[in-house]
Amino acid sequence: MNTRLTVTVKIQAPSIVQKRLQLLFGAFICAIIFTIHASSANAKNDADAKKVYQMAYSATLDPKSGQAHASVTLKQHRQLVRSIEFVMPKERYLNIRPTARTEINGDRVIWKPLKKGDTLYFDFVIDHQRSNQKMDARITTTWALLKLDYLFPSATSRVVKGATSKTTLTLNAPTQWSIETPYGGGAGRLFEVDNTHRNFDAPRGWVIAGELGVRRENKDGRHITVAAPLGSGLQANDVLAFLRWTMPSLVELFPNTPQRLLIVSGSQDMWRGGLSGVASLYLHSDRPLISGNRTSPLLHELFHVASGLHSKVGADWIIEGLAEYYSLTLLLRSDGISKVRYNQSFDRLAQWSADTPCIATDRSKGKQTARGALIMRALDAEIRSETGGKASLDTLVHKLEQANEDLTNSSFRAAVMEITGAPMRALASCP
C-alpha cells in the first residue's frame, strides 16, 4: 500500500518591526558608504587646496616718470614655489629691489621666495621703439599702451608637482583714466587672471589706459572691446561692423576663440602695423580692414589670437603664411569677397612674391609671408585630393592647435604626414 506524505511549510511574513529594522540597517550601511566617499572627496579637495598658491601682480602707471612701478607678490602656506627666474633686461627694468633670497646675474633675476611668501619690486620703462624707430609701447600725459608680457617679464618657475596658482592683476593709474585689459576693463582696477594650459599664470596681452574712446559688442558669445586714445583716428564702429560679419567664420574655425577680445590702437606715430597678444591685438588706425590685395590685417592678427599657434626659430613663415592665407579665406567664407576676387588676390600674391623662395627665417614679412600663403593654399588642395575630401588645411590647423606646442619645420611636416600618409609637393621647396 502506497502512502503519500504531504508536508506543508508555512513561511511567516516578516513583521512590521522586522521590516523597519531592515530599512534602518540598509539606511545605516548607505550612510557609512556615503560618509566614506564624502571623506575621500573632502580629503582630495583639501589636498588640492593645499597645492594652490596666490600670485598678485600690481603696477602703477606713472606718466611723470614714464614708468610703471610694479611688484609681484607670492603667498603660500608652504613651500610650493621654490624659485622663479625672470628675464629682465637692464634697459627696461630698473631699481629691482631684491630680497635676501634673490640673485641677479646680468638680465636674469632668480627669485627664491620665502616659505610663506614674498614680494619683488621693480620699475619698468614703458616707452619702447622697434627696429624701425616706431613705438610699440608708449605712455603720455593722457594715455598709456603696452603689453603685459613685457611689464611682467617671462619667467621659468620651479613649483611642486600639481601646484597651481590663483592669480590677480591690479593696475593703478591717474583717477580720470579708464583701463582696458584682456581680463576686463572700465572703471575696474582688479582683474582675475586665468590663462589656459598654464599652471603658473601671469598677466598677458595688451593693456590700454587713459582718456579713451571705447566701443563694446557681443557677437557669437564673444565680448569684443575696441579702445583707443581720444582723437587717435581709430574708426571703432567700422571695426565692430567688420567683425559682425566675419566673427562667425572665425569662431567656426576656432571654437576656442577667447571669450573676451580686446582690440587697441594708439597715436599716429606708433608702429604702423598689427601685433597680436593673448586675447588681444594692436592695430594702427591707418591700417585698412581690407587692404589693396584684399587680405585683411585685422583678420591676420585675429588668426594669431584665436589659434594660439607659435613657432620656434626658422618656422615663422609657417605661422605667418597660415595667418595670411586665412585672412583671405575667412573673408571668402563670410561672403566678404567673391570667389573670383579671392582667386585674383592669390594671383597678385604670386606675382608679387615670384622671386622669393620659401626660406627658414626668424621673422617672416612681406613677400615671404605672401609666399607662405600661396604654399598653404597649394597644401590645402593637396590634402583634399590625397584624402578624398575628408581632410583639409582646417584639419591640419586643428591638429596643430590641439598639440599646443611651438611649431618647427619638422613638426609641421610630421603633422601633414599624419593626415595624408605621404609627403606633399607643396612643401618640396620648403625648409
Predicted regions and their residues:
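Bacterial N-terminal signal peptides
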Residues: 26-36
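Acidic/His/Gly-enriched intrinsically disordered linker/tail segments
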Residues: 292, 312-387, 398-404
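Juxtacatalytic substrate-recognition/specificity segment
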Residues: 213-315
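N-terminal secretory signal peptides that target proteins for export/translocation
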Residues: 1-20
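Boundary at the C-terminal end of the N-terminal hydrophobic targeting segment
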Residues: 38-43
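Beta/coil-rich, acidic/histidine-enriched accessory regions frequently appended to metallopeptidases
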Residues: 44-75, 403-431
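Extended, low-hydrophobicity, Ser/Thr/Pro/Gly-biased non-transmembrane segments
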Residues: 51, 58, 63-65, 71-77, ...
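Solvent-exposed beta-hairpin/edge-strand motifs
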Residues: 78-106, 170-182
